[in-house]
Every structure is written in C-alpha cells, then in structure tokens.
Amino acid sequence: MSGSMYDDQYYATSRRHSLVTPPPSVAPRQNRMRSQSVRVSNGTVSTDNSMSSGRVSEATNITQPPAYSKKFVVVGDGGCGKTCLLISYSQGYFPEKYVPTVFENYITQTLHRRSGKTVELALWDTAGQEEYDRLRPLSYPETDLLFVCFAIDCPASLENVMDKWYPEVLHFCPTTPIILVGLKSDLRNKRTCIELLKTQGLTPVTPEQGQAVAGRMNASYVECSSKEMRGVDSVFQLAVDTVVSLEEQNWDTRLPSSSGKPGGKPIGGKKIKKRSCKIL
C-alpha cells in the first residue's frame, strides 16, 4: 500500500473514530543516535548557550560532547502554548507575541542529572492548525519522545487530546513514550480567566482531569507555566530521564553479555539502533 493511500485511510478513519484504545503494554523501542550535523537544517535555532534562569550555569558550562542525542516532538492545538514552552526552556525568555508555527526546530543541551552525561536535545515544534494535518507527520520519524500538550485555560484543547492528538501520535508512533503536558498553569487561578470561562459554563482544567486523560493514554502527566518559568525544567528533566532510562534498558536487554546471553552491557560502547516512528 502506498504512503499516500495509507495516510488517506488514516485521516478517513480518524474522522469516524474519535477515541483509540491504548494498545497492550509494549516496551518503547529505542531510537538510533543522530549527529547534530544531521539534525541542524534551515530554520533550526541552536541554543547551546541558553540563558534560561534555571539552566544558565548548566548550559554554559557544558564542555563534554553529547553522550546522547534525542529528538522530542511537541503536538497540540494551535495557540495552546507549545512554542512558548520550547522557547522558554531553550532560550530562557517568554515570547509575548503569538506567531503561529509551521515547523521550527530548537537545538539545546542539558545534563542527565543521575549520570552527569550531556544530552543533546532536538526540540521539534509543530503546527496545530487543521490545514497542516498532512504535513505534520513529516516531523514524526525517529522521534524519541512526544509531548502532547493542552492549555489549562481551554478545556476544549484537553478534549482534543483524545479526539485528535492521541489517535494521531498512536498511529504514527505507536511505541514512542508520551508525556501529557498541561500548559498555562498560571491561568488556572486567574480571575479574568475564571470569569471568562464561567460565561461559557466552563472552568479551567483541574489537575485531576489532566491525570485522568493521561491515565487513558498510559502517559506521564505534568503541568507548567512558561510565562512564569514554573515547572518548565521539570517537564524536560522528566523527558530526559525517560529516554535515557529506556536506552539503558535496551543496553541491558538487547545486547549479549560476556557469556553470550542477553542482558549484558554495551560491548565497545556500541548500541542497538532502532527507529520507533515512521511514515508507512
């Protein structure tokens, strides 16, 4: 079946079925390492010298070459705060002006806190608008982790997680780990936000509602405020811990030990290389 026919079938099916039941538990497959030269292209913003308030010394003092190279893709409704999340983390400031994203990549580095090793992150921003539905899957190949985002001040964006975003990423990246991220947490208790939603018979999304949806996705759940820089570092530290742990598990389970049986450490530093996201 050709790629175009396959995609047509998916989009036709996604309109009929708004909810997809998670598949049986499958250990996420580890992606292959990618060099920065492969990652960097036109439109990529390199942020190795990030001035993030929480990461200044870490980002500027990293001198060792990356031990890991990971790709994170961010999806969610347009205007829910995806770009602000990536810019706040990688560049250390909150963009006040909203400019819709088509595709944008950010390259930055951080430390895996347990091991102290350097991790290079390629952060892929995507467009949430419907007119880009057929272009967005181009971002998915070789993804190590997915951030599925919604805005806490917009209950409809959480509904769309199960109606649109989870089915889409499950289709294209069935074994890639997911973190559900509640954005704009600073608006939950803001009076103007509460009053505006009240006129529509709505309330801001509660932590319990976010946790419930994450449970249906078999995903981790975190919240943050990019504007206040609250919880942003925790979002990415959880992501880094997740993908590094998966790679270490792959070393233990997929490579032979000195006795020739599975379960050994990497031999000569070599790792099994696999892709977990692809366009069929």
UniProtKB/Swiss-Prot annotation:
GO molecular function: GTP binding; GTPase activity; protein kinase binding
Motif Effector region: where in chain: 98-106
Protein name, per record: GTP-binding protein rhoC
Superkingdom of source: Eukaryota
Keyword S-adenosyl-L-methionine appears in the UniProt entry: no
Entry-linked CDD domains: Rho4_like
Region Disordered: start-end pairs: 13-59, 251-275
Binding residue positions for GTP: 76-83, 125-129, 183-186
Propeptide: 278-280
UniProt-listed PANTHER family: RHO FAMILY GTPASE
Chief location category: membrane
Species classification: Eukaryota, Fungi, Dikarya, Ascomycota, Pezizomycotina
Annotated family: Belongs to the small GTPase superfamily. Rho family.
Pfam families, alphabetized: Ras (PF00071)
